[in-house]
């Protein structure tokens, strides 16, 4: 009986060690990397994010916010797109190590509806990689 219990405990411990490589590193400071040039990258991938290169009457952008997620630390930037008279649509864009890793229509956990926004001239930012 004791041998079986020891075998089960040993198996669980070894299984836990092999799983550790699949989990993100939440403690490392460089997982998210430095703040990306998000305005430039979003301007060049706007069609992928919104589905249309110029889909709105107004387009606004928030500042980059560092967040922790299941994929590890990342930067979140929110976009507010409005085509009048329809209600605005919010999009969340995620960056890690200077690369865009994900984008989606904003969900409640992204908190894009409560962010502060500024006007976004994506045509001007498309050619200037120095803007953040």
What are these regions (language model features)?
Residues 18-132:
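Cystatin/cathelin-like cysteine-protease inhibitor module
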Residues 1-17:
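Sec-dependent bacterial lipoprotein signal peptides
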